[in-house]
């Protein structure tokens, strides 16, 4: 279990400068502020449900699906409920299937692929195989449904948030710690980007910045 948590921390540690919270690190650091203020700003970005808070939303959505889909192996019933979620008629009314889609990855998110492997092993060890395969079915159905409903012409894959909440749950980590664990891992990446910003000593970043 310690190995799985270690892998999760490594996968969340850094993911380039294009994500919202890391870009926040660059923007705030460019003003010349101190490290604590820059990291605090990045934390504010990360906690949002469309960013680092998505793993908690995936977990809550998964519990909602388990309660409302009677036969977890019935793909028709599962598909119909996922459509309700997308049509804002179920779960939190956002129309989002959390943990699906990424700005860069389409075919697969390598972080999710690695975490899924460990999730499967943990689920087998803890007697939660049925739950794992339900999550797996959601993953395989959701991509096509999202593309169809949103009229998108690209593949949509699960991102790292899709399986991280499931892994944390199996490890008996409480929900309120999901996003803080993400932050603990990502601070190393934020600090690296802050150092990069300070070393380059560039102009203050503004909306028209190039």
Language-model features: locations:
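Non-transmembrane, aqueous-exposed alpha-helical and coiled segments at domain scale
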Residues: 1-210
